[in-house]
Swiss-Prot record:
Short motif Q motif, span: 41-69
Motif (DEAD box): 194-197
The protein's name: ATP-dependent RNA helicase DBP4
Subcellular location: Nucleus, Nucleolus
Positions of region (Disordered): 581-612, 653-754
Biological function: ATP-dependent RNA helicase required for ribosome biogenesis. Involved in the release of U14 snoRNA in pre-ribosomal complexes. Required for pre-rRNA cleavage at site A2.
Domain of life: Eukaryota
Keyword hit for Membrane: no
Family, as annotated: Belongs to the DEAD box helicase family. DDX10/DBP4 subfamily.
Record-linked InterPro entries: DEAD/DEAH_box_helicase_dom, Helicase_ATP-bd, Helicase_C-like, P-loop_NTPase, RNA-helicase_DEAD-box_CS, RNA_helicase_DEAD_Q_motif, SPB4-like_CTE
UniProt feature, compositional bias: Basic residues: 667-678
Species this protein is from: Vanderwaltozyma polyspora (strain ATCC 22028 / DSM 70294 / BCRC 21397 / CBS 2163 / NBRC 10782 / NRRL Y-8283 / UCD 57-17)
Domain text: The Q motif is unique to and characteristic of the DEAD box family of RNA helicases and controls ATP binding and hydrolysis.
C-alpha cells in the first residue's frame, strides 16, 4: 500500500491558495454562465467542481435531463427554486448537485455543523436519496446522515453533531431538533423539499412549520415535485419571495390558470377498464395470470386490503412471485421487500401509496391501480413508477361505472386521456369460489377480509370529491360476496374523520401529544384510576382473546338481523354481585365430628352408594348396560334355537375368515422380514471376512478420529499394531498364530476364518 504523501507548511499553504483561487474562478464562471446561450448537454458543460464531476462520471451520470439543464445553473447562482418535472426525469440530481457545490464553495467542514437539510415525505424515498448521494459524493469530504423512523434514535443522536448533509423524514428531523444536543442549524445553507406538495399538505403542516421555525431565514430553498403547488400561503411559510419556477409543463400558470402540458411521460401507455366493484379481484387475478412474465406494481387504497389480497392470492398460487408493502410493516421488512423487488425480474408487488412518490424502481412493466386514487396528483405519482428516464411503460386503472365519468373529467383537465380497454371473455376468470373456500377454512383470513371490506368502505366515505366517490351507490353486499364473505360486516360511520384529520393524526409526534398531559412543572400527570384494585382472579375472568375470538371480531361477525336498536348503548356484561341469602338452599350439616368424618370419607360414602354401574351409549344417545340379558319373549320372537345357533356360528365363521386373511398377511410379512434379516446378517459376515483378508492394505484416514500417535506410526508396524488392538479370542495366546501346542495340553491354533478351518479344528480335537 502506497504511503500517504505528507506536505510541509509551505506546500500546504500553496495548496490552500490554489484551492481558494480555483473556487473564485468557479464562482466567476457561475456568475457569467448563461444556460440559454451555452445550452449544456453533458454535466461536464456545467460550471461545477472536479470532485462532483468525478463522482458523476464514476456513477455513469453523463447526460443532462431537461429539469437538470434548467434548474442546476439557477441553483448554483443562489436562487430559490420551485422545480416541477415529469416523473422519472432526474429531479434527485437536480438538487443534490447544487447542495454539494454550495458546501464545496463555502469550504465546509465537520466543525461547521449542519450545512444542508433534505426532507422527504416517506422513508423509502429518503433512503433512495441517501444512496444516490453516496454514489456521487465519493470524491468529496462531506459527511452525510440518514434519520428516519424505525431506526435507533440514540445511535443517530450520538453522530448527528458531525453531519454536514442530513436527509430524513419530517417527524424524525423534528424529534432530533427537540432532543439532540449537538444538532446546530444556525449555519444552515440549503433546505431541500423533495415531493414538496406532499410535505406541504395537511399531514405534515405542523411538523414542517416547527422545522422551518428553527432554520435561519438567509438559507437557500429548493422545492421539487412532479405535481407542484404555487399556493402563496405555502410559499410564504417557507419564506419564498424571490424564486425561480423551473420546468413547469404541469403547473398551473398563475396568470391565466391554464394547464401548459401533461405531467406524465410520453413513453407511458395509459389505459383504463370499466369494471364493477364486485368483479375487481376477478379482473386483477385474470390480469396477473395473463402477465406472468412481467414486473408490476398493484396499488390499493389501504394496508388491510394489501394484506388481504396478498394472503389470498399467495394461497391460490398464480404462478408469479408475490410481495406486499404498506406503512404498517416494520422498517426492516419494508427495506427487505424493496431490495428483493428491485432485484427480481418477474414479480408482482401489492402496495399502498407509501411507494407512490419518488421511488425509482428498475424496469417496471405495468402499474395497476385497483382502487381509484383520491385525486389526479396521486394518479400521476402512481403511474410515474414506470416509463422512467425515457423507457417504455404501461399503466391501467380500474374504474367503476360510478367513478368513470367524474375521474376521466378530472384527468382531462390535466390533459391526460387514457384509452379504454376491452377485456376478452376468455381471459376472465372468477375466483369467488376459491375465496369462499379459503375464508371458510381459515377464520383469521375471514377476519382479515372483513377488515379489508371495512377499510375500503370507509376510504370511500371520507373522500371529499363526492362527484367521483358516490358512497350511496356502492354495492356493499355484492362486494362482500366477491371477497368470499358470507355477508357484509357491520360498519359504524359515526364520528369518522376526514382525510386531512387522519393524515394529521398519523404524522403527529407522540411526544408532542404526551405534553398535553403534563402539569405546570412539565411532569407527566397520570389519570387516577376510578376502578378498584383488581386481583389476579378478576384479571383471569376479564381476559379476552386477541385473535379471531376478540371482541372486535365478534362485533363485526354478528348477523344484523339478530341485532336490536338498543344494542348500541345496552349490552350484557359479566359482573360480580352479592347473592341473596334467601334464595340459597338450606343444606343440613353433620352435627358430630364422627358424622363429619364419615361424610368426608370416600370409603364410607361408597359403602352407602353401592357399586358403580358401567353403561354404554347407542347412536341415539340412550344409555344401556354393557351386558344385557335377553328376555324369553324376545328369544322366542327371534326364531328357533337351532336356527339362532346356526346363524351365530355362520356369523362368527365369516368374522374368523376375514381375520384369517389378515393374519396370513401378517405372518407372511413377518416371515419375509425374518428372511431379510438373516440374509443381511450373512452379508455383513461376508463383508467382515473380506475386510480381514484385506487388512494389509493402506488405511483411509478420517478427520477428527483416532490418535495423533496412530497417524505418526511407522508403516512397517501396521500388522503388529493391528494385532495388538484387535481383541484376542479365547484360543489365542500372547504369541499370535502359534501352531505349536503348549506343555499343559492346551491346543493353540490360529483363529478359524472359514468353514474348512472349523472342520480341521474339530478333527484335531477328536484325535487328541
Amino acid at each position: 500500500m502506497a504511503k500517504k504523501q505528507r506536505y510541509n507548511t509551505t506546500q500546504r499553504k500553496e495548496l490552500r491558495k490554489k484551492e481558494v483561487d480555483y473556487i473564485k474562478e468557479l464562482e466567476t464562471k457561475i456568475d457569467e454562465y448563461d444556460a440559454s446561450i451555452n445550452k449544456p448537454v453533458f454535466f461536464k458543460d456545467l460550471p461545477i467542481s472536479n470532485s462532483t464531476l468525478k463522482g458523476l462520471n464514476d456513477s455513469a451520470f453523463l447526460k443532462l435531463t431537461d429539469i437538470q439543464r434548467d434548474s442546476i445553473p439557477m441553483s448554483l447562482k443562489g436562487y430559490d427554486i420551485l422545480g416541477a418535472a415529469k416523473t422519472g426525469s432526474g429531479k434527485t440530481l437536480a438538487f443534490l448537485i447544487p447542495v454539494l457545490e454550495k458546501l464545496y464553495r463555502e469550504r465546509w467542514t465537520e466543525f461547521d455543523g449542519l450545512g444542508a437539510l433534505i426532507i422527504s415525505p416517506t422513508r423509502e424515498l429518503a433512503m433512495q436519496i441517501y444512496e444516490v448521494l453516496l454514489k456521487i459524493g465519493t470524491s468529496t469530504s462531506f459527511s452525510a446522515g440518514l434519520v428516519i423512523g424505525g431506526k435507533d434514535v440514540k445511535f443517530e443522536m450520538e453522530r448527528i453533531s458531525k453531519i454536514n448533509i442530513l436527509i430524513g423524514t419530517p417527524g424524525r428531523i423534528l424529534q432530533h431538533m427537540d432532543q439532540a444536543i449537538g444538532l446546530n442549524t444556525s449555519n444552515l445553507q440549503m433546505l431541500v423539499l423533495d415531493e414538496a406538495d406532499r410535505c406541504l399538505d395537511m399531514g405534515f403542516k405542523k411538523t414542517l412549520d416547527a422545522i422551518v421555525s428553527n432554520l435561519p431565514p438567509t438559507r437557500q430553498t429548493l422545492l421539487f415535485s412532479a405535481t407542484q403547488s404555487q399556493s402563496l400561503e405555502d410559499l410564504a411559510r417557507l419564506s419564498l419571495t424571490d424564486y425561480k419556477t423551473i420546468g413547469n409543463p404541469d403547473i398551473l400558470n398563475p396568470s391565466n390558470g391554464k394547464v401548459l402540458g401533461p405531467s406524465t411521460p410520453e413513453t407511458l401507455q395509459q389505459s383504463y377498464i370499466n369494471v364493477e366493484l364486485p368483479d375487481k379481484l376477478d379482473m386483477l387475478y385474470s390480469f396477473i395470470k395473463s402477465h406472468l412474465k412481467s414486473k408490476m406494481i398493484v396499488f390499493l387504497s389501504s394496508s388491510k386490503q394489501v394484506h388481504f389480497v396478498y394472503e389470498t392470492f399467495r394461497k391460490m398460487q398464480p404462478g408469479i412471485s408475490l410481495m406486499h408493502l404498506h406503512g404498517r410493516q416494520k422498517q426492516k421488512a419494508r427495506t427487505e421487500t424493496l431490495d428483493k423487488f428491485n432485484r427480481a425480474q418477474h414479480v408482482c408487488l401489492f402496495a399502498t401509496d407509501v411507494v407512490a412518490r419518488g421511488i425509482d424502481f428498475p424496469a417496471i412493466d405495468w402499474v395497476v391501480q385497483v382502487d381509484c386514487p383520491e385525486d389526479v396528483d396521486t394518479y400521476i405519482h402512481r403511474v410515474g413508477r414506470c416509463a422512467r428516464y425515457g423507457k417504455q411503460g404501461k399503466s391501467m386503472i380500474m374504474l367503476t361505472p360510478q367513478e368513470e365519468e367524474g375521474f376521466l373529467k378530472r384527468l382531462a383537465s390535466r390533459k391526460i386521456e387514457p384509452s379504454k380497454l376491452t377485456i376478452k371473455q376468455s381471459k376472465k376468470k372468477s375466483i369467488k369460489p376459491q375465496l369462499q373456500s379459503l375464508l371458510f377454512k381459515d377464520p383469521e383470513l375471514k377476519y382479515l377480509g372483513q377488515k379489508a371490506f371495512i377499510s375500503y368502505i370507509r376510504s370511500v366515505f371520507i373522500q371529499k370529491d363526492k362527484e367521483v366517490f358516490k358512497f350511496e351507490e356502492l354495492p356493499t353486499d355484492e362486494f362482500a360476496n366477491s371477497l368470499g364473505l358470507p355477508g357484509a360486516p357491520k360498519i359504524k360511520m359515526k364520528g369518522t374523520k376526514s382525510v386531512e384529520q387522519i393524515k394529521q393524526m398519523k404524522n403527529a409526534s407522540r411526544q408532542l401529544l404526551s405534553l398535553a398531559k403534563t402539569n405546570e412543572d412539565g411532569e407527566l400527570v397520570e389519570e387516577k384510576s376510578k376502578q378498584p384494585v383488581r386481583t389476579k382472579y378478576d384479571k383471569m375472568f376479564e381476559r379476552k382473546n386477541q385473535t379471531v375470538l376478540s371482541e372486535h371480531y365478534l362485533n363485526i361477525t354478528k348477523a344484523q338481523a339478530q341485532e336490536d336498536e338498543d344494542d348500541d348503548f345496552i349490552s350484557i356484561k359479566r359482573t360480580d354481585h352479592a347473592l341473596n341469602e334467601e334464595e340459597l338452599p338450606q343444606l343440613s350439616l353433620p352435627s358430630s365430628r364422627r358424622a363429619q368424618k364419615r361424610a368426608l370419607s370416600k370409603k364410607a360414602s361408597l359403602s352407602t352408594k353401592g357399586n358403580a354401574t358401567r353403561v354404554v351409549f347407542d347412536d341415539d344417545g340412550a344409555a344401556h348396560p354393557v351386558y344385557e340379558l335377553q328376555g324369553e319373549e324376545d328369544f322366542i320372537k327371534a326364531g328357533a334355537a337351532e336356527d339362532q345357533k346356526l346363524e351365530y356360528l355362520q356369523k362368527e365363521k365369516d368374522v374368523m375368515n376375514e381375520v384369517d386373511v389378515e393374519d396370513k398377511q401378517v405372518a407372511k410379512q413377518k416371515k419375509q422380514e425374518k428372511k431379510r434379516k438373516r440374509l443381511e446378517a450373512i452379508r455383513r459376515e461376508m463383508e467382515a471376512d473380506m475386510d480381514n483378508e484385506s487388512s494389509g492394505e493402506e488405511k483411509v484416514p478420517f478427520l477428527g478420529t483416532g490418535n495423533l500417535s496412530d497417524d505418526m506410526q511407522d508403516p512397517d508396524s501396521d500388522d503388529e499394531e493391528g494385532s495388538r488392538l484387535r481383541k484376542r479370542s479365547r484360543f489365542e495366546t500372547n504369541n499370535n498364530y502359534n501352531d505349536n501346542d503348549s506343555d499343559d495340553g492346551v491346543i493353540q491354533v490360529e483363529e478359524p476364518q472359514t468353514l474348512e478351518d472349523l472342520e480341521s479344528l474339530t478333527a484335531r480335537l477328536i484325535d487328541n
